[in-house]
């Protein structure tokens, strides 16, 4: 059972019971797209006669997401650490994600999140939030190089971003694809999609994929990252604009 804390971090707001109920329902809706049998549903937590009950008949005081529990050792991040992930797993994930992205929703609102304006806003926010870590986890030279490179790319590739929008490549994606959100068990479960902020999941499918590819490279598995990218391109039919962006 998963309960949301009544917190407000700016990018997420769970401060009212109604908001927590809504985001519990969104979490189930979004994650059933990739692992329906892992997300069982949303249940009220009630209080009566001095006792809390899950699914009771009293007035709800909280809501919870009921999920199927899987063993932590089946996490892809753990299996990578033990050297248990091979190219077949990459092929399977590529097939799953290409199909998922093909079926994911898109509309005029979602497409707008692929605009230069919003992409730049996301990057500027990222740079603002990481500025305080200069000299601690990133050097000033590295920080400025990354910022300059990103801003130059955005200025130079306006037509590329417009093409991706017109080609309907901006979708309601997962938003947090990395090896810690994938179970390799009786089958592949890709879970924990972002429910609390549209701006994190309304994105180019290339951005969704890039997060997982980057994670594999960070874990020193460039071979698996390259395999996943190659197979995703094969299965999805994406062209040169996908690789360029």
Model-inferred region functions:
Residues 1-174, 179-245:
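Conserved ATP-binding subdomain of kinase catalytic cores across diverse folds
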């Amino acid at each position: 059972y998963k309960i949301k804390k009544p917190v407000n971090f700016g990018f997420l707001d769970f401060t009212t019971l109604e908001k927590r109920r809504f985001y519990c329902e969104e979490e189930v809706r979004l994650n059933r797209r990739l692992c329906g049998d892992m997300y069982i549903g949303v249940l009220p937590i009630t209080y009566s006669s001095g006792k809390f009950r899950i699914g009771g008949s009293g007035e709800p005081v909280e809501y919870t997401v009921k999920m199927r529990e899987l063993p932590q050792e089946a996490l892809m991040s753990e299996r990578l650490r033990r050297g248990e992930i091979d190219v077949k797993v990459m092929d399977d994930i590529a097939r799953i994600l290409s199909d998922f992205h093909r079926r994911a929703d898109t509309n005029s609102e979602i497409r707008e999140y692929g605009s230069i304006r919003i992409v730049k806003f996301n990057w500027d926010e990222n740079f603002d939030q990481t500025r305080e870590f200069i000299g601690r986890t990133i050097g000033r030279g590295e920080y400025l190089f990354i910022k300059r490179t990103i801003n130059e790319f955005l200025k130079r590739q306006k037509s590329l971003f417009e093409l991706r929008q017109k080609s309907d490549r901006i979708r309601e994606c997962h938003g947090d694809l990395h090896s810690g959100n994938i179970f390799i068990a009786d089958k592949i479960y890709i879970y924990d999609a972002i429910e609390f902020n549209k701006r994190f999941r309304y994105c180019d499918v290339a951005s969704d994929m890039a997060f997982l590819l980057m994670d594999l490279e960070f874990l020193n598995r460039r071979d698996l990252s390259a395999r996943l990218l190659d197979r995703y391109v094969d299965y999805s039919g994406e062209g040169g604009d996908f690789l360029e962006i």
